[in-house]
Amino acid sequence: MITDEFKSSWDFTKSYSTYHFDSVKIDRLEDVIDHLGHIEPTWQADLEDIVANSNPATWETRGYKGEGIPPPREDLLAEEYDIERVGADPKMIITHINWRIPDSLQAIAAAFGLDDCMERIHVQQPGEVWNLHIDKLQKWCPEDPSKIGRYFVQLTDWQPGQFWEYGNHHWNQWRAGDISTFDWANMPHSTANAGHHPRVTFQLTGVITEKTKAFLATL
């Protein structure tokens, strides 16, 4: 949660981040992303419905810790301030989200074995931008945030015009089935779609368990 001394979410998270914030420095892929492995896609038959049934989301409606859960007012004001102060619309659509998880993906979520798991599918349509930020996931385990994991399963292949930036590294050419994570507490990141196809990603966030570790070891 944003503290009273900060008006900006970006300034708040940057104040404790260990990232270098040197725009001249070149970040390698392995510096900013942990590529955990690859699984064979089993969800192709569900993709059309996933995209069709996704709904537009803003910072306010993204689901703070689950579907329909709004962020604390002080957090939202600080997040929208970061957008507004650079001349953009604080109510802009940052992505589409689908909270209806098909059986093919529920099986994957079960394999991860995260406690208090939030599962959502990001469908970033052409023209949508999720502005630069650092995640604030401490709410999942305030007593020990190191136990919190955020994982991504790419549901579609990368297409030209789709951008995912971690630190100073522009990540592209992922394949459906790629699984990754990153240092969510410190790594600035953003996404955008300037292409011709939706970018579809299954995101899982929760508390890491022994089952999680065992599953990741099999990848």
Regions found by a protein language model. Give the residues of each.
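Short proline/glycine-enriched turn/loop segments at secondary-structure junctions
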Residues: 141, 189-195
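A short beta-loop-beta micro-motif enriched in histidine and acidic residues
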Residues: 115-117, 132-151, 167
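Short, conserved beta-strand element in jelly-roll/cupin
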Residues: 122-125, 142-160, 205
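A short hydrophobic beta-strand segment most commonly corresponding to one strand
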Residues: 149-155, 179-181, 196-213
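Conserved metal-binding segment of the jelly-roll/cupin
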Residues: 172-188
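A short glycine-rich, His/Asp/Glu-containing loop-to-beta-strand
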Residues: 110-133
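Non-heme Fe(II)/2-oxoglutarate
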Residues: 1-115
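A short beta-strand-loop-beta hairpin characteristic of the jelly-roll/cupin
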Residues: 151-175
